[in-house]
Amino acid sequence: MPELSVILPARNAAGTIARAVASTLAAMPADSELVVGNDSSSDSTVGEAIRGASRGGVVDPRLRIEDITPGEGGVSRVLTQLMERTDSRLVGRMDADDVSLKGRFKRTMRAIERGDDMVFTQMIELRGSRPVPRMPYEITPEDMGWHLLLTNPVCHPTMLATREIIDRVGGYRAVPAEDYDLWMRVASAGGRIRRLAAWGLLYRIHLGQVTGNKAWRSDSWKNPDQAQAF
């Protein structure tokens, strides 16, 4: 088994996934895999993912594509299936419309080896073609709990975590904010969560994002399971 599996949910992402795949493979160590979960895409998502992993007609063997079983649960369903189909010690995340920056995994893996359970990098927002860097300051495990009570201070597709901590708290759940719900349960279980100051991702901002929807935000706070984690 590889040391690291980076899981990437994708649905009709043909316009962006090639760059997401290429940049992530470029940032990943040799002993790793990038596992794309194709969630019933009706466009050329799979072909574009393969194109992003190809150099000189050769596909990077670290790319693996998994067809996701349809059903309810949204992205949490995809992530759960990808967790079940991988067995690496470390788990990373990536989204199909973002861009990984070089050095991302080297920095986060170093923090894991120093004793953290879950590590994030800071991000640079990509608003159209305009990059907007977020303030590059670190949040230590000692301070993370306070930050989580006030807001979600970390970006899911920058995550690197031990599989052990994710499994210990029950993995992803079918709630509106499956990422924040996981962070809260990890923190409550005594997990060490850190956000590094360094930028590790270009995070694309666009109108269609679910998290920017007011109805989603309302449903998120009303969900009883998520409220219990908080």
Locate predicted features:
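Cell-envelope/extracellular polymer assembly enzymes that use nucleotide-activated donors
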Residues: 3-5, 33, 181
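Short, acidic, metal-binding catalytic loop of nucleotide-sugar glycosyltransferases
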Residues: 22-31
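Short beta-strand/loop segment that forms part of the nucleotide-sugar
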Residues: 31-40, 66-68, 96
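A conserved acidic beta->alpha catalytic loop
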Residues: 38-48, 72, 95
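Glycine-rich, basic loop-to-helix element that forms the pyrophosphate-binding segment
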Residues: 68-86
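Short aromatic/hydrophobic "clamp" motif used to bind/position activated sugar donors
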Residues: 91
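Conserved donor NDP-sugar-binding/catalytic core segment of glycosyltransferases
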Residues: 103-133
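Conserved nucleotide-sugar donor-binding catalytic segment
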Residues: 143-220
